[in-house]
């Protein structure tokens, strides 16, 4: 296949993926490698939006959040995603990729607010859009934000980048007999109790008939192979 399989995609990155082998924070070499993968896909003409988590930063302050009100802790997590989004966008700009960070909570001196028509305009102009601050509401994960934004922008697929190269029948780190699914339906994943995304995000994707591709961001070239429609990771579909 010489042309990409998708025109517009939503890439979900976990904050933990930015840590590399560090205990928390942002590993510079890791983020530069991710940006190289992202820029390669962008240059193929694929319209790319990104939702990133905040676990790598929140992990460093988590002990101090014990006993904290859940909503307050969630807002702290949203701010962590803004920091990650700024770091990612800055790294992209340094390699000549135009990126725009749009936040679900107002921090107008730092990033612009999320406005759907503006996000669509940026994508059509070939810019990468990084959605920060989750959904802007506590009690919702960044997985749910990825499903929501993916549906809003009309993405053809949600690409969930993890440290594991797909969905397995069991934990491959614990069960040597665990097998990777190449494709699986939403209903099969539910019946087999496979953890693909949190329940809210998973239900939203299923209801909107928005497929999910789970793949390893650690594998070199995996993102490009996914976008080109090659057999990489696990496709979850209706």
Curated annotation (Swiss-Prot):
- NCBIfam families from the entry? pyrH_bact
Any GO molecular function = UMP kinase activity
What's the protein name? Uridylate kinase
Key words of the record: ATP-binding, Cytoplasm, Kinase, Nucleotide-binding, Pyrimidine biosynthesis, Transferase
Among Pfam families, the record links this protein to: AA_kinase
Which gene is this protein's source?
pyrH
Q: Which reaction does it catalyse?
A: UMP + ATP = UDP + ADP
What's the subunit arrangement here?
Answer: Homohexamer.
- Please give an example of a GO cellular component term from this record: cytosol
């Amino acid at each position: 296949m010489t042309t990409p399989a998708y025109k517009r995609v939503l890439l979900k990155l976990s904050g933990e993926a930015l840590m590399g082998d560090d205990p928390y924070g942002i590993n510079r070499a890791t983020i530069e490698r991710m940006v190289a993968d992202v820029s390669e896909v962008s240059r193929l003409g694929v319209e790319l939006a990104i939702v990133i988590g905040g676990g790598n930063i929140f992990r460093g302050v988590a002990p101090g959040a014990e006993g904290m009100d859940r909503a307050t802790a969630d807002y702290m997590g949203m701010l962590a995603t803004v920091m990650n989004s700024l770091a990612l966008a800055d790294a992209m700009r340094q390699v000549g990729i135009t990126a725009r960070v749009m936040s679900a909570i107002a921090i107008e001196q730092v990033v612009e607010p999320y406005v759907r028509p503006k996000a669509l305009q940026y994508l059509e102009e070939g810019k990468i859009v990084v959605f920060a601050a989750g959904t802007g509401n506590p009690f919702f994960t960044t997985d749910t934000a990825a499903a929501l934004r993916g549906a809003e922008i009309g993405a053809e697929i949600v690409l969930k980048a993890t440290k594991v190269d797909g969905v397995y029948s069991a934990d491959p780190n614990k069960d040597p007999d665990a097998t990777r699914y190449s494709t699986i339906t939403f209903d099969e994943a539910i019946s087999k109790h496979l953890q693909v995304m949190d329940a809210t995000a998973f239900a939203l994707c299923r209801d909107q008939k928005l497929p999910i591709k789970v793949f390893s961001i650690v594998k070199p070239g995996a993102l490009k192979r996914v976008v080109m429609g090659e057999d990489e990771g696990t496709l979850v579909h209706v």
